[in-house]
Amino acid sequence: MDVYQIELEEQAQIRSKLLVETCVKHSSSEQQQLQVKQEDLIKDFTRDEEEQPSEEEAEEEDNEEDEEEEGEEEEEDEDEEALLPVVNFNANSDFNLHFFDTPEDSSTQGAYSEANSLESEQEEEKQTQQHQQQKQHHRDLEDCLSAIEADPLQLLHCDDFYRTSALAESVAASLSPQQQQQRQHTHQQQQQQQQQQQHPGQQQHQLNCTLSNGGGALYTISSVHQFGPASNHNTSSSSPSSSAAHSSPDSGCSSASSSGSSRSCGSSSASSSSSAVSSTISSGRSSNNSVVNPAATSSSVAHLNKEQQQQPLPTTQLQQQQQHQQQLQHPQQQQSFGLADSSSSNGSSNNNNGVSSKSFVPCKVCGDKASGYHYGVTSCEGCKGFFRRSIQKQIEYRCLRDGKCLVIRLNRNRCQYCRFKKCLSAGMSRDSVRYGRVPKRSRELNGAAASSAAAGAPASLNVDDSTSSTLHPSHLQQQQQQHLLQQQQQQQHQPQLQQHHQLQQQPHVSGVRVKTPSTPQTPQMCSIASSPSELGGCNSANNNNNNNNNSSSGNASGGSGVSVGVVVVGGHQQLVGGSMVGMAGMGTDAHQVGMCHDGLAGTANELTVYDVIMCVSQAHRLNCSYTEELTRELMRRPVTVPQNGIASTVAESLEFQKIWLWQQFSARVTPGVQRIVEFAKRVPGFCDFTQDDQLILIKLGFFEVWLTHVARLINEATLTLDDGAYLTRQQLEILYDSDFVNALLNFANTLNAYGLSDTEIGLFSAMVLLASDRAGLSEPKVIGRARELVAEALRVQILRSRAGSPQALQLMPALEAKIPELRSLGAKHFSHLDWLRMNWTKLRLPPLFAEIFDIPKADDEL
């Protein structure tokens, strides 16, 4: 029975080990080793079983009956053995461990011989020791599994424990020579822990190599290691074999315990037998001499988690946090106030980083480096030449994208229409010419202001609330320039106050604000809209922004100005003056608006005088074919009437000439109808009128506006049209009469004697157009307020262009006196067209000409 007891005990051990392997999921190689071991045990059992019958043959010869009974008992025992592997043993049950520890008075005890009893007692003692060790191992297994359920991090230690325990028997022979090395390693670990406690800042961030566990990569850690990313620091230990003792079989680290050199994880490792033996030894060492204590393991993992929380952040994360804090403390440094291209962004980034870079003044049109002050705007050479060619050749551009192209340095040549429109909106004009050069100090201050604006705009800039919503970085830059020039300008503007007090002698003036600079300022033009709905005046928000931009640029150029507001209170004029140095905006003051007469405060609050000047000036230049530049080199040619051989009488000949001349004259005047309509749409406030009022103003004021434009080409003998063809005095008398021709020539000669510029002619034409006393107007007061604003703009322009001239104060009343004369010529001209209305069937007139003068047309021309 001892043999059977041994056999059952061996099977119980095998079952227990299989259960342990199932719990911890051993690898296939370890399972194969256990299977081989199980087969060896089965072979030993079979060999002992074969020897057992040979010893019992002598006893069986004495009594055959007893042998038969014993044979039956053996068969019964074999049947029981076949059923034993099917039994589901509990690895932790005392039944499996002590099933055959029967008492001494058992009935089966006397059936064995004394020799076998002695051998069985020795074997039982050995088996008892093994059972105790195995029982302790199973208890540790249960403790570790419970710890894993409580904290998943315990799997790292438990997995290492079970792997080493599974290999304990295979390396039992090699454990004894390695015990001394383990003691040294334990001593080294204690020293490292003491060093870490003394120097927490110099903790070693070491990592064990990855351990394969069911296809997942885990970090096997010891009590001196930390969780975290792999460190590249190669720390040298006092012991030569400090790093080799932590290698695992599946690690990617190089380990050489024989050489004792320390290497970092991830390095190239030579797959040698020494590293494999070292890994096996380290695993077996931990299983044989150090039994896993669940409490110690839990405290170790908790200590490691605490160290992980106290681990300092990487350097890159610290830098990102510092940069974020700097951005919160200095948000203004993150704004770029440079150009709209790559060079400006690079410059602003260099300034933010503290790198000094040479700043430059940008071009107002494309953002390129400005070469100077051209046509009233700081611009580059490319935009200066483009604008000069455009105004000299009068090129008409077209945009394929509805005038919404972006104009920057890289693509400024793609759309000429949008580029020219941006030149106009930036303030480029033939009249906006500077007198003198920019002082050197002003240029230096401009450069300093540009560099400081790139670093961040100061918070002390005074910006109007109306412009803050649409403020552009360039506005901030130029407002900073005027802030730097404030002290210099305060010393210059004082003598100019006396000059502008002469405005008290002017007649009735609307309550608007006037800025009269000592040197010609360059306010920005209002944008010329591409759609008819946006025409008829400058948008108030855009105009304020444009004006703020250019008023500050004018101040930066060394000019200074005086804020003059003439208001009417109780029928008496009052001059409200004050210095205006470094002003951010040109809007009307609140107290001045409240004192305006006849409700003009709304108009004065929406548009400034300079907005009106520049809007009307640009409208005139774009839509008038009689400007100074266009007429300077005009090739003049006479209009010759062909001979009529059919006419038999003088009356018939004169009628033929009159018909032919009207056809020629109307054909050349009709293009001016469309131009004047476009000009009227761009006059500030015109599109706010009702459609009926707009139609009345254009139809009744067309000839008067056209005559104001063409007066430059009228002399005592001829009237020259925009194509160079001229009509003689005799031909004009054929069209009209001698009285009308005399009045027309006198008016033109007088107007030419005043020497008006294109801007002044445009403003005067707008005044003529905005006649509030036309018959049939529904809102004459609204038209009258718009006319007063234009009249004030003309007055300011005259004083500005003729500063110091004695005729400056007399010119505006003279021009206002010419308006009734012009109205009389318009009425006479309308009456002369009655002949065309009566004889419209004899000649073919352009439909637009016939429509604007109420001349009947054929049905096919409607």
From Swiss-Prot:
Known DNA-binding region: 360-435
InterPro entries reported for this sequence: NHR-like_dom_sf, NR_LBD_DmE78-like, Nucl_hrmn_rcpt_lig-bd, Nuclear_hrmn_rcpt, Znf_hrmn_rcpt, Znf_NHR/GATA
Biased composition (Polar residues): 105-119, 463-472, 516-533
Any single biological process term in GO: negative regulation of DNA-templated transcription
Bias type Basic and acidic residues, positions: 37-46
Biased composition (Low complexity): 173-206, 230-291, 308-335, 342-353, 447-460, 475-508, 539-555
Positions of the NR LBD domain: 626-855
Gene Ontology molecular function: DNA-binding transcription factor activity; sequence-specific DNA binding; zinc ion binding
Biased composition (Acidic residues): 47-82
SUPFAM superfamilies, per database record: Glucocorticoid receptor-like (DNA-binding domain), Nuclear receptor ligand-binding domain
UniProt-listed Pfam families: Hormone_recep, zf-C4
Coiled coil regions in record: none
Region ranges (Disordered): 28-83, 97-138, 173-210, 230-353, 444-557
UniProt entry tagged with the keyword Magnesium: no
GO terms for cellular component: nucleus
Keywords: DNA-binding, Metal-binding, Nucleus, Receptor, Transcription, Transcription regulation, Zinc, Zinc-finger
CDD domains documented for this protein: NR_DBD_DmE78_like (cd07165), NR_LBD_DmE78_like (cd06941)
Cellular compartments annotated: Nucleus
Family to which the UniProt record says this protein belongs: Belongs to the nuclear hormone receptor family. NR1 subfamily.
Role played: Induces the early late puff 78C which triggers puparium formation and development.
UniProt-recorded name of the protein: Ecdysone-induced protein 78C
Source organism of the structure: Drosophila melanogaster (Fruit fly)
Source taxonomy: Eukaryota, Metazoa, Ecdysozoa, Arthropoda, Hexapoda
Gene that specifies this protein: Eip78C
